[in-house]
A protein has these predicted regions:
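A short, active-site helix/loop in glycosyltransferases that binds the activated sugar's phosphate group
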Residues: 1-16
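Conserved catalytic-core segment of nucleotide-activated headgroup transferases in glycan assembly
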Residues: 16-77, 86-89
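Short acidic alpha-helix that forms the nucleotide-activated donor recognition element
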Residues: 88-99, 120
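Short glycine/proline-enriched, acidic/aromatic patches that form the donor-sugar handling elements
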Residues: 92-93, 110-112, 130-137
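Acidic donor-binding loop of glycosyltransferase active sites
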Residues: 97-110
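Short hydrophobic beta-strand element within catalytic cores of glycosyltransferases
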Residues: 124-129
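A charged, aromatic-enriched C-terminal amphipathic alpha-helix characteristic of glycosyltransferases
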Residues: 147, 160-190
Length: 190
């Protein structure tokens, strides 16, 4: 809308127009915990088993509002996986409080506006190009080619082991989503 507005006004008017960004209702801060959330109604989750096995220091919470297929239920063999078939609203809320990463790696439709909720809970969102449901909330540098799952896993490992790196990725995520503060508005409006 801002770009379209600039096309409609004179250069003089454009000099008095500023893009302010968006104020989001952030529910919490990221606590730098090794807890990841995946919400899905599909058992088609890009590179899930290799991520779980190659990044074992992360605990993966996988929830679905439906029953889970045997393919997903088989992941219970991993000690770092918790499954939530027929997940309740209360469980979802609790997991958004506990997790600090959201892996947007499920194929098919997004459920429960998951990426927006993850963003508003300050979870770092990582996705693949063929699974990303929330590009407005996911920094482009955090969206990986499915052919480059190794880079996805490396970024996840680095973020787990380096609080400064995780903070940097969260800053890029907020910048991409044009997060503004009340102070930003006061500077422009007065």
């Amino acid at each position: 809308a801002y770009t379209n507005l600039l096309k409609l006004v004179s250069p003089e008017q454009a000099s008095r127009v500023a893009f302010l960004g968006f104020m989001y209702p952030f529910a919490r801060q990221n606590n730098f915990q090794n807890q990841a959330l995946i919400l899905t109604n599909s058992d088609q989750i890009e590179h899930l088993e290799s991520i779980v096995s190659e990044v074992p220091t992360m605990h993966y919470h996988i929830g679905a509002i439906t029953e889970m297929s045997s393919r997903l239920m088989d992941l219970a063999k991993y000690s770092n996986v918790s499954l939530y078939p027929n997940i309740t609203t209360e469980q979802v809320k609790r997991l958004y409080q506990e997790a600090d990463f959201y892996l947007d790696i499920n194929h098919q439709n997004e459920i429960l506006s998951a990426t927006r909720a993850a963003f508003e809970n300050n979870l770092l969102i990582l996705a693949f190009t063929n699974t990303s449901h929330g590009p407005d909330y996911t920094a482009p540098s955090n969206i990986f080619s499915a052919m480059n799952a190794g880079q996805f896993k490396q970024t996840l490992k680095e973020a787990l082991g380096n609080r400064d790196f995780l903070s940097h990725l969260l800053d890029r995520q907020r910048e991409h989503a044009h997060v503004a503060t009340p102070e930003d508005y006061k500077k422009v409006i007065g």
